[in-house]
Amino acid sequence: MDQVTYIKDMIRGSLMAAAAGDALGYAVEFIDKSTIDKLYGSDGIMAFELNGSKALISDDTQMSLFTANGLLMGVTRCAMRGIGSRPEEYVYVAYRDWYYTQTRDRRIEDSYSWLRALPQMYSLRAPGITCMNACESIVQRDEPQNNSKGGGGIMRVAPIALLHSGYIARARSFYTHEELARAGVTIARCTHKHPLGFLPAALLTLLLAEIITMSPEEVALRIESVVAKCLSVVGELYGVEYRDDVLYLEELTQRALRVAHSHLTDVEAISLLGQGWTADEAWAIALYCAVHHIDSVERAIIAAVNHDGDSDSTGSICGNVMGAICGYNHIAERSIFCPTGRSLEQTLELSDVILAIADDLSTSCLINEYDALDTPEKQLWFERYCEMKPTGIRQM
């Protein structure tokens, strides 16, 4: 398999496994482990809780998709005009569109994403208060004011690492490690202002960009050294300005790695890391589950959602990591968490939208200001990211 095809599969895997973890955890997000056990047995929830025939995603997946749409609109705008801001600067306007889907706020007239045109994006799935309040400020053209370290920033940041990987696979320059870390911080910090609300996003971004190019066997051997490298980059960038927070994040990350090699049960280990309601804890829980269950995407995600805390976010972040390791073909073949006889694409809500976004992230921008739009692929790209039309997507 050539590098472009391989990375495309890993990008698909990261987004789809994240959505699967989100959907699995969404069913138990607001109940504790003892209640989960009463409802699903001592092993916890291990299969999708279906609404009709679909496993429903939460606001985590919604916002991840809008993040990706904003990034892709940004790179396209730069290509078509020859100038522009960095792609991560365009997620702000994409989040305005997400806010519109949740509120139908009439002040938001212009659309900057084709996702906004899809009726299926308008479902309310327990959107986070911090994200909603921050987006309200963005709509008012104010800077969001809070000191939140909630997990609403890190759970949506993966697309910047995936976009970067798509460019690298095609031997096109994109970001340095430092620039990539800053991009992750920018995306999370636009809504969450506490350092522990945005620094973990840099770690996740760096981790995904590193492991996505490796074989599963190589990741299993090297993941701890990769995490150490990620910590080093974040420490160099932010260790002076946010010294105490960086030191704490380093200690928590090391604790997650230590318990991943212990004889503790998943529930016992996760209890030492938190509940996942904050970005630092969500990062630590997802990392523990991925390292401890490095050879099984199912076991990793199941562990990540069966605890007392923010199950959909920890499941989603763990899915981002595990999907970037094993790829989409692997999880599709296994129909993870699906009823017997049904595929992941059939079962997971918005799977067609998720895969379309994933493929666009892996493609890199197809057009520029001098382009004749002389192929169907270029025309589709123009309609999605210049005209904001959901071309090629079935509307429900």
Predicted feature residues:
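Structured, active/binding-site neighborhoods that engage oxygen-rich ligands
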Residues: M1-M396
